[in-house]
A protein has these predicted regions:
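Class I SAM-dependent methyltransferase Rossmann-like catalytic core
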Residues: 25-55, 59
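Class I SAM-dependent methyltransferase SAM/SAH-binding core
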Residues: 71-73, 77-122
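A conserved beta-strand element that flanks and buttresses the S-adenosyl-L-methionine
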Residues: 134
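A short, conserved alpha-helix within the catalytic core of class I
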Residues: 142-153
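Core SAM-dependent methyltransferase catalytic element
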Residues: 220-238
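Conserved beta-strand signature within the Rossmann-like core of class I S-adenosyl-L-methionine
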Residues: 159-167
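C-terminal alpha-helical "lid/dimerization" subdomain adjacent to the S-adenosyl-L-methionine
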Residues: 167-213, 220
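N-terminal auxiliary segments of SAM/dcSAM-dependent transferases
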Residues: 6-25
Length: 238
C-alpha cells in the first residue's frame, strides 16, 4: 500500500463542508483577479495540465485528437485552455476551447477561446455540443448533490468524452502542501483556502458512487501521483 493510500485509509474519511474564501460572491473584481493570478502560479508550478496531456492522446486516440471542440467548466482565467491549446498546436492539432464560468474574468487579448457565463449545474448548450468536456480542480467547490448535477450536465453536452480532474483527499498530500506553498511565497489567504480544498477533495470510491448517480456509463477513476483524482468516461460506440 502506497503512503497516500495509507493516509487515505487513516484520515479524512469525510469531505469537509467548510467554505473557501475564494468562493465568496461579494469579493471585488480586482481582488478576484489578483487571487486568480496567484492561483494560476500555483497551478503552473504543480503542472495542473499534466493529467490531460499525459492521458488524453492515448485514451482518445491521436487521430481523434487532431481536431477537438472542448468545453472547460469553471475555467477561471482560461489558463488550462491556453496551455492545452498551445501544447496541441505544437503537435499540429487544433483544440478549440469554450471557457464557461459563473463569473467570467477578462481573458488576455491573445486568448482565442469563447467565453460563456453560466452554471456548471445547468450548462447553456445543446446535447452533444462538444467532443470533450473537462474540468480542473473546480468540482471540490460543490456539494455531493451538485457534483452529480455537474457531471450529468457534462455528460449530456459531450458527444464523446468527459475528463474531470480534482484533488485527492489524504493526509499525506495535506501535510506536504502547506510547506510547499510557503516556500513559493503564496499569500496566507490562498494557503488557507488550499488546505480547505484538500479537505474538500475526494476518494476514489466516492467518485465512482457519484458517477453512478450521474448515470455516466463505464466511468474510470484513478489517483494521479497521490495528489489528484481523475474521472474519465466515453460514450458507447467510441
Amino acid at each position: 500500500m502506497c503512503i497516500f493510500k495509507l493516509f487515505e485509509s487513516m484520515f479524512f474519511h469525510q469531505r469537509s463542508t467548510q467554505a473557501e474564501y475564494f468562493d465568496a460572491p461579494e469579493r471585488p473584481v480586482a481582488e478576484r483577479l489578483a487571487a486568480f493570478r496567484e492561483l494560476d502560479r500555483v497551478n503552473q508550478f504543480f503542472r495542473f495540465e499534466h493529467p490531460f496531456v499525459s492521458r488524453l492522446p492515448s485514451w482518445l486516440g491521436e487521430a481523434h485528437c487532431a481536431s477537438l471542440e472542448i468545453l472547460d467548466v469553471g475555467a477561471g482565467t482560461g489558463l488550462l485552455g491556453r496551455v492545452l491549446s498551445d501544447w496541441a498546436s505544437r503537435r499540429g492539432w487544433d483544440w478549440r476551447f469554450t471557457n464557461l464560468d459563473l463569473n467570467p474574468l477578462p481573458l488576455p487579448r491573445e486568448d482565442r477561446a469563447r467565453i460563456v457565463a453560466g452554471s456548471a449545474l445547468e450548462l447553456p448548450f445543446a446535447d452533444g455540443h462538444f467532443d470533450l468536456v473537462v474540468a480542473s480542480q473546480m468540482t471540490h467547490h460543490l456539494t455531493d448533490e451538485d457534483v452529480v448535477r455537474h457531471w450529468r450536465e457534462a455528460w449530456r453536452v459531450t458527444r464523446d468524452a468527459i475528463f474531470i480532474c480534482d484533488l485527492h483527499r489524504n493526509a499525506g498530500f495535506y501535510a506536504l502542501l502547506g510547506p510547499a506553498l510557503r516556500l513559493m511565497g503564496i499569500g496566507s489567504q490562498l494557503r488557507r483556502d488550499a488546505m480547505i480544498s484538500v479537505r474538500r477533495g475526494f476518494h476514489r470510491r466516492e467518485w465512482l458512487e457519484l458517477a453512478a448517480r450521474a448515470e455516466i456509463s463505464d466511468p474510470k477513476v484513478c489517483i494521479y501521483y497521490g495528489t489528484r483524482i481523475v474521472l474519465q468516461a466515453r460514450k458507447s460506440g467510441r
